């Protein structure tokens, strides 16, 4: 079979355009992992976030590895009221965590 591949994780903060439209969505991209099963957990500061999370089913990429994404929908108030948000991806027993922090400037 294929060798296991750890996912690469990229976390995108809400865009300024989106915040101006009074929305805030964090996007966690998970790519190049094998086998195609991951667990995604979101954290605000260090407390778990359950509401507003949507994670896609992993799909096979052209290189036969898998990719998935997870979305966290927030209000701008929620986004600004925490020091940081983290996307925690667990794959085959190992965990990758990426963190974004809201900037002060609007």
Swiss-Prot record:
Effect of residue 83 to R: In IMGT allele IGLC3*04
Disulfide bond annotation, renumbered to this chain: 28-87
UniProt xrefs under InterPro entries: Ig-like_dom, Ig-like_dom_sf, Ig-like_fold, Ig/MHC_CS, Ig_C1-set, MHC/Immunoglobulin
Keywords: Adaptive immunity, Bence-Jones protein, Cell membrane, Disulfide bond, Immunity, Immunoglobulin, Immunoglobulin domain, Membrane, Secreted
GO biological process: adaptive immune response; B cell receptor signaling pathway; immunoglobulin mediated immune response
Chief location category: secreted
Pfam families (UniProt xref): C1-set
Assembly and interaction partners: Immunoglobulins are composed of two identical heavy chains and two identical light chains; disulfide-linked.
Function: Constant region of immunoglobulin light chains. Immunoglobulins, also known as antibodies, are membrane-bound or secreted glycoproteins produced by B lymphocytes. In the recognition phase of humoral immunity, the membrane-bound immunoglobulins serve as receptors which, upon binding of a specific antigen, trigger the clonal expansion and differentiation of B lymphocytes into immunoglobulins-secreting plasma cells. Secreted immunoglobulins mediate the effector phase of humoral immunity, which results in the elimination of bound antigens.
Note: Alleles IGLC3*01, IGLC3*02, and IGLC3*03 display the following serological isotype: Mcg-, Kern- and Oz+. The Mcg-isotype marker is characterized by Ala-6, Ser-8 and Thr-57; the Ke- marker by Ser-46 and the Oz+ marker by Lys-83. Allele IGLC3*04 displays the following serological isotype: Mcg-, Kern- and Oz-.
Protein name, UniProt field: Immunoglobulin lambda constant 3
Origin species: Homo sapiens (Human)
């Amino acid at each position: 079979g294929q060798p296991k591949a750890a996912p690469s994780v990229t976390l995108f903060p809400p865009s300024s355009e989106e915040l101006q439209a009074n929305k805030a969505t964090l996007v966690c991209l998970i790519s190049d992992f094998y086998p195609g099963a991951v667990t995604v957990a979101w954290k605000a500061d260090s407390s778990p976030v359950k509401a507003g999370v949507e994670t896609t089913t992993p799909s096979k990429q052209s290189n036969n590895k898998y990719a998935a994404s997870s979305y966290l929908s927030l209000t701008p108030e929620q986004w600004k009221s925490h020091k940081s948000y983290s996307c925690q991806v667990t794959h085959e027993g190992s965990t990758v965590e990426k963190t974004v922090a809201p900037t002060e400037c609007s």
